[in-house]
Regions:
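Beta-sheet entry/capping signal
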Residues: 13, 53-55, 66, 163, ...
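Short beta-strand
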Residues: 57-59, 164-170, 211-215
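Flexible loop/turn segments at secondary-structure boundaries
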Residues: 63-66, 76, 141, 173-175, ...
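Signature for HUH/AEP ssDNA processing cores
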Residues: 96-169, 180-188, 305-306
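C-terminal accessory nucleic-acid interaction domains of nucleic acid-metabolism proteins
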Residues: 1-29, 33-35, 46, 50-51, ...
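Polyanion/phosphate-binding surface patch
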Residues: 52-83
Length: 306
C-alpha cells in the first residue's frame, strides 16, 4: 500500500479511508482486507463485470449493521469511473460500470461488499447475453437436491445444445448461467427459462418448485427464473457475500459438484487464491459462446411435450 493510505492502480490513486474498519465482526476482517481481496481478484473478476450496469451491496459499517442496495451512482464518484444511464419506471437511473481494476478497488473502499451485474450489457441493455437459473434451497441440509437439480438442468441444456456454466452462490445454492447471443429481449428469455425449469419441476414436484413465496415452497428447492428480467441481477463471479466468513461466489467445474467435500460456501476470501493458484477459472472461455434461444426453442417445446 502506498503512503497516505492510497493504492496506485491503473494509473489512478485510490485513497483507502478507515482501512482498519471491521467489516466482518465475527471474523475480524477489515475494510483493507476487502480492498486487498478485490485488488487481487480483479484480473479474474473484472471480465465478468465489464460493460454491465452494476447494483452495489454496501455495508459501510460492516455486515453486523444494516447495509443498503445502491443503484444510482453517487454524485461524488470520480469522473474516470464509467457510468451508464438506463431507463426505469418513471425516468432514468445512472449505474456504475466496472471496466477496470481501479474502479473495483474504489467501490471496495466505499464499503461495497457485493457486486451484482445486469444480465445485459451497456451496448444494448434490453437484450440479455446471459440467462440464469438460481437453485435456492429452503433448508440448509438439502445440498444433494441443489446439486441434483443443477445436474438435471445441465443434462437438459445439453439436449438443447446450449452451453452451461455453474458457480456457487457463496451461500446455500448454485447459479447456472447460459451465455447468449443477445438477440432476444428479457421477456422472451424469461419465458424460455421458465418453460425449461418446468421440465425439472414436472419430473419431481416434491423437491423442486417455481413458487417464489417461501411459505408456499413447503421445504422444496426454488428454481428462480425471475432474475431473467430487465434490471434484475445476481451476485457476480468472485463477489464476496455479506455473510460470516466472507464467502465468495465462485465458478466451478461441473465435475466438482460431485465431490464429497463440495458445498456452495466452500470458498472464502481466505482460501480462494489457493484454488486459483492450482485450478484454471472454469468460466475463462465463457465469452466464446453466444447461444441462440431462437434456435433452441423448437427443441425446448419438444422436450417439454415429451
Amino acid at each position: 500500500m502506498a503512503k497516505d493510505n492510497a493504492i496506485e492502480i491503473d494509473g489512478r490513486s485510490v485513497e483507502i479511508t478507515r482501512p482498519g474498519k471491521i467489516l466482518f465482526p465475527e471474523d475480524g476482517i477489515t475494510k483493507l482486507d476487502v480492498v486487498n481481496y478485490y485488488q487481487r481478484i480483479a484480473p479474474f473478476m473484472v471480465p465478468y463485470l465489464e460493460n454491465r450496469p452494476l447494483v452495489l451491496q454496501r455495508f459501510p459499517d460492516g455486515i453486523g449493521r444494516p447495509g443498503f442496495i445502491q443503484k444510482a451512482v453517487a454524485p461524488y464518484y470520480p469522473a474516470w469511473i464509467k457510468k451508464v444511464t438506463v431507463k426505469k419506471a418513471g425516468g432514468t437511473v445512472k449505474h456504475v460500470v466496472c471496466n477496470d481494476d481501479a474502479t473495483l478497488v474504489y467501490l471496495a473502499n466505499q464499503g461495497c461488499i457485493g457486486l451484482h451485474p445486469w444480465l445485459s450489457r451497456t451496448d444494448d441493455v434490453n437484450c440479455p447475453d446471459q440467462m440464469i437459473f438460481d437453485f435456492d434451497p429452503s433448508r440448509d441440509d438439502d445440498l444433494a437436491g441443489v446439486v441434483g437439480g443443477a445436474l438435471i438442468l445441465k443434462e437438459l441444456l445439453d439436449k438443447l445444445e446450449l452451453p452451461a456454466f455453474v458457480k456457487t452462490t457463496g451461500s446455500r445454492g448454485l447459479h447456472v448461467v447460459v451465455p447468449l447471443d443477445a438477440t432476444q429481449d428479457f421477456d422472451t428469455m424469461r419465458a424460455f427459462a421458465r418453460e425449461l425449469a418446468e421440465v425439472i419441476v414436472d419430473r419431481d414436484s416434491s423437491r423442486y418448485t417455481l413458487e417464489a413465496h417461501k411459505e408456499k415452497r413447503k421445504g422444496r428447492i426454488l428454481i428462480d427464473v425471475n432474475r431473467n428480467g430487465y434490471a434484475q441481477t445476481a451476485a457476480a463471479a468472485y463477489s464476496i457475500r455479506a455473510r460470516n466468513g466472507a464467502p465468495v461466489s465462485v465458478p466451478v467445474g461441473w465435475s466438482e459438484l460431485r465431490k464429497r467435500n463440495f458445498r456452495p460456501n466452500l470458498y472464502t476470501i481466505q482460501n480462494i487464491f489457493a484454488r486459483l493458484d492450482k485450478t484454471d477459472d472454469p468460466w475463462k472461455d465463457m465469452g466464446k459462446f453466444h447461444a441462440s434461444l431462437k434456435s433452441a426453442a423448437p427443441r425446448l417445446h419438444s422436450l417439454h411435450a415429451a
